[in-house]
Amino acid sequence: MLHHHCRRNPELQEESQIQAAVAAGDVHTVRKMLEQGYSPNGRDANGWTLLHFSAARGKERCVRVFLEHGADPTVKDLIGGFTALHYAAMHGRARIARLMLESEYRSDIINAKSNDGWTPLHVAAHYGRDSFVRLLLEFKAEVDPLSDKGTTPLQLAIIRERSSCVKILLDHNANIDIQNGFLLRYAVIKSNHSYCRMFLQRGADTNLGRLEDGQTPLHLSALRDDVLCARMLYNYGADTNTRNYEGQTPLAVSISISGSSRPCLDFLQEVTRQPRNLQDLCRIKIRQCIGLQNLKLLDELPIAKVMKDYLKHKSDDI
């Protein structure tokens, strides 16, 4: 036992010495110890390598030296199965990430999953690291990877209200209708009108219902008595006759809350009674034909500006 302690003690001292050098950004000492044979892939009690440590601390020059001396960025720690790239994402260390992504290990780390199925893109979206999100997508990270709970980076960005990340992910064709329309329903439930408008403008399907009860975004607007959301949804094509699993239309849901006059109830009664005009039906159909991926290219269509504005709902009073 004494022999084991004596043998281990110098190793622990070396580990502490090189970690202290990394923390201080002392590249000279780091390089010297590596050249003397210190392995960059040794792991501490948490399973961290020196690459984990330097990536989390933001020590770019140390990361470069470790990679030059054979550091392996695919190693996962014992805390959550995170790679050094996950920690770089957590702290927004985009320049450090670029060093790792330009290495031979890129394909092994860019979509690497933690114990919970989180990729670096999940982490970056969760923490709102928009420049990091851009970098990962530049290096062709999978835009809609599913965690073990079936969550995508876009969903995390929405839940955490990381607006910049949301826009970047949508610009890179993240699935706006993931989990049968989760994003639009979430925006309605949270009464987040700016998100609701953004998703609708980008072509979110207004009529997808929750798998557990069939409630569409318009049903949820009725439940929340949110007339602004209801107007937006209707203008973008929500079907007032869609029924949930209990056989209720949005109007029936609104009446079930209270039969007395309320803005949302009054609106739903009005639009349920009257059919859409031909002009609005044409707009809905044209937007559907253009398709999700091409809606952002409306400005490039060889049509009059007034028609482009109409297709973008710019004249809507909502």
UniProtKB/Swiss-Prot annotation:
- Which one Pfam family would you cite for this protein? Ank_2
Q: From what organism does this protein derive? A: Pongo abelii
| Domain named SOCS box: residues | 265-318
Query: Which pathway or pathways does this protein act in?
Result: Protein modification; protein ubiquitination
Q: Does the keyword Transcription apply?
A: no
Q: What is this protein called?
A: Ankyrin repeat and SOCS box protein 7
Taxonomically, what lineage is the organism?
A: Eukaryota, Metazoa, Chordata, Craniata, Vertebrata
Described function? Probable substrate-recognition component of a SCF-like ECS (Elongin-Cullin-SOCS-box protein) E3 ubiquitin-protein ligase complex which mediates the ubiquitination and subsequent proteasomal degradation of target proteins. Plays a role in spindle dynamics and genome integrity by targeting the mitotic progression protein PSRC1 for proteasomal degradation in a cell cycle-dependent manner. Also participates in meiosis by mediating the proper attachment between kinetochores and microtubules.
Domain description: The SOCS box domain mediates the interaction with the Elongin BC complex, an adapter module in different E3 ubiquitin-protein ligase complexes.
Query: Which gene is the coding source of this polypeptide chain?
Result: ASB7
Similarity comment:
Belongs to the ankyrin SOCS box (ASB) family.
> What does the annotation say about its assembly with partners?
Interacts with CUL5. Interacts with RNF7. Interacts with PSRC1.
Top-rank taxon, per record = Eukaryota
ANK-type repeats, residues: 13-42, 46-75, 80-109, 116-145, 149-178, 180-208, 213-242
Q: Which residues cross the membrane?
A: none
